[in-house]
Amino acid sequence: MDTKPVFHGSDIEKICSYYNLKKENIVKFGANVNPLGLSPKAGRAIAEHVDILSSYPDREYTSLRNTISSYCNIPADFILPGNGSSELISLLIQERAPKHTLILGPTYSEYSRELSFSGSTQEYYHLQESNDFEPDIPDLCRKLEQGYDFLILCNPNNPTSSAITQEELRRLIGFCAEKNIFVMIDETYVEFAPDINAITAVPLTREFTNLMVLRGVSKFFAAPGMRLGYGITGNMDFLAKMREKQTPWSLNSLGAFAGEIMLQDEDYIKETRNLILSERDRMIRE
């Protein structure tokens, strides 16, 4: 039986070829990227400093980690920059080597893809439309008692937009800590949330060693081609082991430099949040 191919939102060339379309006639909704585009300040800085590509980046990414530290209000030692969140997902799964994984879904397919290389079983905890795709935390905990050692969730979740509050996350991660379950939380979309502090798990990395939070610049900062992601965990031993497995200089010099500019561009951050939140309200009204 013939099956249609499945495309990622970035596979524009493949889509054009398969459907015989022109690139300029495609309106992209699959990548969820900030409609404002790249920060003008970052764009100018990249153009003015492109010569840094002639030098290797700092292997420790010290300046970038310090910038992320200020941006997230977390110690720089907790931070591991990488070649997009995809590299960090892969490194985390390789190092953790889970046997039985539970994923909150529907969600981003890359988690499942990386797990398929690890030998871990994987099962979805399906969020229900009847409950506005909000997870039932007590029920989720009961499910986790069935032999799982790894939990993956995206918060806010893509594509449902549902979010788990920080207090609910604290209870969930605490339960997982008692059961020796490691938790990976993908916060790729957290900057789009109305109240970031109400749902981010980053502060919880100070409390729990069975937690890693992933973020990046692909969506909110409209820079998916930069391939800059970062992981945050208070588990220093685990972080060191991930770093040992990471390819040296996996993030290029220009990406590391531009990441610092973007994360410090408060005007762009404010403009983006104002646009997204006001447009969200307008869409709901209309």
Regions found by a protein language model. Give the residues of each.
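PLP-dependent aminotransferase class I/II
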Residues: 38-39, 60, 210-286
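Glycine/small-residue-rich loop that forms an oxyanion/phosphate-binding "nest" at active or ligand-binding sites
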Residues: 84-98, 185-189, 193-194, 204
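Short acidic capping loops at alpha-helix termini that bridge into adjacent secondary structure
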Residues: 24-25, 75-79, 100, 187, ...
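PLP-dependent aminotransferase-like
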Residues: 95-153
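Short loop-beta-helix segment that forms the pyridoxal 5′-phosphate
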Residues: 57, 69-91
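Active-site phosphate-binding strand-loop segment of PLP-dependent enzymes
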Residues: 131-193
